[in-house]
Amino acid sequence: KSLLAALADRRRSDQKAATECLEDMTKPTDTPVPLDKMLADRVIYAPQMAPIHFPVICAALGAVGWRVELLPEVRPQAIEEGLKHVNNDACYPAIVVIGQLLDALKTHAVDPDHSALLLAQTCGPCRATNYPTLLRWALKDLHLERVPVVCLSGGSIEGAQTLNVGLGGLRRLMLATLYGDMLQRLSLHVRSHELHPGDAQRLVDRWTAIAAQAAAAGDARRFADDARAMVRDFFAVPMDGTEKIRVGIVGEILLKYHPAANLGIVQEIIDEGAEPVLGDLAAFFLYCLYDHINQAKVFGGPRLKAMGAWLMIR
């Protein structure tokens, strides 16, 4: 054969092998088990993304019956695990998120026979809908296919089942997000100006516990009083009173929020004498909801989904 013919044969062989591999990864292997039964004796482990918000969000999920534990940190080894098992074409956030979960399993911090893995999904604005398939692929490499993968999502995701939180759970998640946004805004401002380093973090720890309790209770009427008390507590911290340049941090959501993913950019900005500003997590969720409305208006997308998004925004 000529060199060109040999290369063409090789290309066809590689394409066939890749197609067969993808089909094998995506087709169901067993009869689906109801989610309640599947997770009856399992703890659901969630990867870290937003250190201020996620402890409160986990408390909200616990109040609706799901035992959710947050992985504590992103070790350098976790990122190495992500690089090892996630395709190089995937984005860096996928490597960080999946690497956290794989690292916990490989270090035996998580018992694979009594655990499940949780991924949060946007269902539209980015490639995060691919994460469950990438994670299941990595689990197969590690011979851990028995570990369930579940999603916290506004729609159906191939390769994973979706946690059902109901309207009560949705209300609690919204409250958790608002508490987290308030804490984030206040803590970043005070950290940039505090005279005694650590004052802001002590208030964050205190108010995280209060916010987790309030979000779990689902009492929306309490939020306004707590927000005022939160502002009073943070502004009672001794501060330098100087006006500093405010530096906005923008970009992919995980990279913005997680210190291990953004190389500690928040602390670096503070050390340079400026005040970091992070967008609200609630604003990101509103963006996701408006995406459904735009899809219906511009591209003829599902109107029912757009109506649901409009009601949630209201």
Language-model segment annotations:
Residues 1-314:
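An N-terminal assembly and electron-transfer interface module characteristic of large anaerobic redox
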